[in-house]
C-alpha cells in the first residue's frame, strides 16, 4: 500500500503531510451544507454512533510510515461507506471489504468475506457476485466512463469535505453501489 501511495503524486503528498481524521473533522463536517460530501460523512457517522477517535490504534508496526498507512486505511473506511453509498448491513460491509481488497490487496477483505458469508442468506450470497463485479469495476486504474479510479488511500478526503458530493464522486470515479445495481437491473 505504501508503494501505491509513493507511486502517486497525491499519495506522496499525503504521506509527507500525514493528515489525521480526528473528531474535529467530524465536528467541522456537521456544519456543512447537506449537499456536501462532509455533511454526508457526518450523517453516516452520527447515524451509526461512530467517532473517528473510536478506531483502535495501529499496533505492532515499527516503521512509522507503514503505521501511518495502516492508520489511513482504517480512517478512510468510513469515507468509503459514504462515497460508495454503502450502509452498515452485513452485505454492504462485505461489499466495502471487497472494494478495499481490490484497492489494497490486504487479505482482511477476503477473510471478512469468508467469515461473513456464513451469515448471509442464499439471496444475499447471490448478491455478493454482483458486489464482487462492482468492486472490480471500481478497482484502481480500472477505466469506466473515462476517469481512472485512484487508489482510495491517495484521495485527499480531508480536503474534500466542503465539496459537493457529486463533485467528489466525479473526482474519484467511483460508481456508488446503488447506482451500479440500478444499472445492472436495467440490463
UniProtKB/Swiss-Prot annotation:
<comment type="function">
    <text>Lyase that catalyzes the C1-decarboxylation of 4-hydroxy-3-methoxy-5-(all-trans-polyprenyl)benzoic acid into 2-methoxy-6-(all-trans-polyprenyl)phenol during ubiquinone biosynthesis.</text>
</comment>
<keyword id="KW-0456">Lyase</keyword>
<dbReference type="GO" id="GO:0006744">
    <property type="term" value="P:ubiquinone biosynthetic process"/>
</dbReference>
<dbReference type="InterPro" id="IPR027540">
    <property type="entry name" value="Coq4_euk"/>
</dbReference>
<keyword id="KW-0496">Mitochondrion</keyword>
<feature type="binding site">
    <location>
        <position position="93"/>
    </location>
    <ligand>
        <name>Zn(2+)</name>
    </ligand>
</feature>
<keyword id="KW-0999">Mitochondrion inner membrane</keyword>
<keyword id="KW-0831">Ubiquinone biosynthesis</keyword>
<protein>
    <recommendedName>
        <fullName>Ubiquinone biosynthesis protein COQ4 homolog, mitochondrial</fullName>
        <ecNumber>4.1.1.130</ecNumber>
    </recommendedName>
</protein>
<dbReference type="InterPro" id="IPR007715">
    <property type="entry name" value="Coq4"/>
</dbReference>
<feature type="binding site">
    <location>
        <position position="77"/>
    </location>
    <ligand>
        <name>Zn(2+)</name>
    </ligand>
</feature>
<keyword id="KW-0862">Zinc</keyword>
<comment type="subunit">
    <text>Component of a multi-subunit COQ enzyme complex.</text>
</comment>
<dbReference type="GO" id="GO:0031314">
    <property type="term" value="C:extrinsic component of mitochondrial inner membrane"/>
</dbReference>
<comment type="similarity">
    <text>Belongs to the COQ4 family.</text>
</comment>
<dbReference type="Pfam" id="PF05019">
    <property type="entry name" value="Coq4"/>
</dbReference>
<keyword id="KW-0472">Membrane</keyword>
<feature type="binding site">
    <location>
        <position position="78"/>
    </location>
    <ligand>
        <name>Zn(2+)</name>
    </ligand>
</feature>
<comment type="pathway">
    <text>Cofactor biosynthesis; ubiquinone biosynthesis.</text>
</comment>
<feature type="binding site">
    <location>
        <position position="81"/>
    </location>
    <ligand>
        <name>Zn(2+)</name>
    </ligand>
</feature>
<keyword id="KW-0479">Metal-binding</keyword>
